[in-house]
């Protein structure tokens, strides 16, 4: 198959060096690229409400239940660098279409799983397919939008769509489970992937690096062996605390990661060009993306707990209310695009961090009787600032690399966000738990029974449960603490 880059619709004027501007076809193609992006993002969170139904039908063990949740994210994160590099070599649209077909088949397999083992295998297959889709979409945007302003807008839309998918996952899951069986949360992927398979060959251009070299199989194995143990260890520490096995897992991943970097430095055709990290703009932007995702995911954990455990909302109602802060991202995206046309990106990014910090500071003032609007407003401010930072970071990263290296650069972006999310849950989760327990030790009513106080110290949900079993006044005082 001949590989080429489809010319943009409106070429630059003769006699100028201005890059060609994208036309209607490219913008329609962007809409097509958002389909897999939304679905892959939603599959991270779509199982939140389905677990009770899956447990009833498939009867998984506690270990199997954890793997049903986590195997998708582990495999996805571990293969992002591999798939970004593979797309540079075999063609990004080709990899996208292969991934879409595989995602559809894996979704069917997950929906009709007859055992926990089958569902775990299907979720792993979804992770493999998802890893082909995420870097392909961002890399193709780099190839489709050559004009800097248009590319900035397209990447901002891509960034907002990623976060929207994560927020929409629980809502879609809740709505489907109200009317259908648990397999419907996977079947919903199929028609959208079929639409992608039909439309992408017409609307999305093919591109592959002309001199990418041979695929580095050993480097691929090393990247998988580096990412998965580190994310596994971090997530386990966030869930159950520190122990030797989890620390060894992280250490092993870091050692393999060092071996991966050594190989990339010596390889003739590396999966990641380490020279990119000599650019302060590229390295700083990757760090910005990681920090922003670190903060977003860590804050989301507390917000969800507050809505359900403190305000007493049902999971679906909490998920619906959690969509309200997305208004902040809808406002932030176009405002950020306009600001960077007139103000240095560094100042806009700093402003985004400052806005996110203000929202976070407001969230620290929440208490048991805070009105819902206060939480949603603070969360919207926080999300808007963080999304502004991520949009700028992604645009700087993709603008800093030539089109031939866009796939590898997109994989770096995705891997950084995966690490940021995992570390955010672990670090902010641990800090939050420590602050919660410290505050409860000081403010808990003296009359609280020792056993009840121990349960309350364990989790916020435990405190709510215990408070409901105590005498009215004592229970209210415990919740207030």
Locate predicted features.
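Hydrophobic transmembrane-helix bundles of small-molecule transporters
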Residues: 156, 178-289, 295, 314, ...
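Hydrophobic transmembrane architecture of multi-pass small-molecule transporters
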Residues: 10-13, 195, 396, 412, ...
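Helix-breaking motifs and short loop linkers at transmembrane-helix boundaries and internal kinks
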Residues: 59, 91, 112-118, 180-181, ...
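12-transmembrane solute porter fold
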Residues: 26-42, 47-49, 245-249, 256, ...
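Cytosolic juxtamembrane N-terminal segment immediately preceding the first transmembrane helix
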Residues: 1-42
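Extracellular/periplasmic helix-loop-helix junction of adjacent transmembrane segments
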Residues: 50-78, 118, 316-320
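Helix-loop-helix hairpins in multi-pass membrane proteins, especially solute transporters
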Residues: 85-218, 236
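Central cavity-lining transmembrane alpha-helices of secondary-active solute carriers
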Residues: 70-84, 134-138, 323-335
């Amino acid at each position: 198959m001949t590989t080429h880059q489809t010319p943009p619709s409106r070429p630059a004027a003769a006699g100028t060096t201005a890059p060609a501007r994208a036309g209607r076809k490219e913008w329609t193609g962007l809409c097509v690229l958002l389909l897999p992006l939304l679905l892959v993002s939603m599959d991270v969170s779509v199982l939140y409400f389905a677990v009770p139904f899956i447990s009833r039908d498939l009867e998984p063990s506690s270990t199997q239940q954890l793997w049903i949740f986590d195997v998708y994210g582990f495999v996805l994160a571990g293969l992002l660098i591999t798939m970004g590099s593979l797309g540079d070599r075999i063609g990004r649209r080709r990899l996208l279409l292969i991934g879409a077909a595989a995602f559809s088949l894996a979704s069917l397999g997950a929906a009709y799983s007859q055992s926990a083992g089958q569902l775990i295998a299907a979720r792993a297959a979804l992770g493999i397919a998802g890893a082909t889709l995420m870097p392909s979409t961002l890399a193709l945007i780099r190839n489709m939008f050559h004009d800097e302003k248009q590319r900035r807008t397209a990447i901002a839309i891509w960034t907002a769509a990623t976060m929207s998918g994560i927020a929409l996952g629980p809502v879609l899951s809740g709505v489907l489970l109200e009317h259908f069986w648990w397999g419907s949360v996977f079947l919903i992927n199929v028609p959208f992937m079929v639409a992608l398979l039909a439309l992408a060959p017409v609307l999305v251009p093919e591109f592959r690096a002309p001199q990418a070299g041979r695929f580095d199989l050993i480097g691929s194995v090393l990247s998988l062996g580096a990412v998965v143990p580190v994310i596994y260890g971090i997530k386990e520490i966030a869930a159950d605390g520190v122990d030797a096995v989890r620390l060894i897992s992280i250490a092993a991943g870091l050692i393999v990661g060092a071996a991966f970097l050594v190989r990339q430095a010596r390889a003739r055709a590396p999966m990641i060009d380490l020279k990119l990290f000599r650019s302060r703009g590229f390295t700083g932007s990757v760090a910005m993306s990681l920090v922003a995702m670190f903060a977003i995911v860590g804050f989301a954990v507390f917000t969800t707990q507050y809505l359900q455990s403190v305000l007493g909302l049902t999971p679906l109602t909490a998920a619906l209310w959690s969509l309200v802060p997305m208004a902040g991202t809808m406002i932030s995206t176009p405002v950020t695009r306009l600001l960077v046309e007139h103000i240095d990106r560094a100042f806009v990014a700093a402003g985004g961090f400052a806005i996110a910090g203000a929202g976070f500071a407001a969230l620290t003032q929440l208490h048991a009787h805070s009105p819902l609007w206060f939480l949603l407003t603070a969360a919207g401010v926080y999300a808007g600032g963080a999304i502004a930072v991520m949009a700028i970071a992604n645009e700087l990263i993709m603008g800093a690399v030539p089109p031939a290296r866009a796939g590898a650069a997109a994989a770096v972006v995705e891997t950084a966000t995966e690490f940021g999310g995992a570390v955010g849950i672990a670090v902010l989760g641990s800090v939050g738990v420590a602050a919660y327990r410290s505050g409860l030790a000081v403010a808990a009513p003296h009359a609280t029974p020792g056993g009840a106080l121990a349960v309350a110290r364990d989790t916020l949900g435990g405190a709510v449960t215990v408070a409901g079993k105590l005498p009215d006044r004592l229970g209210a005082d415990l919740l207030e603490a």
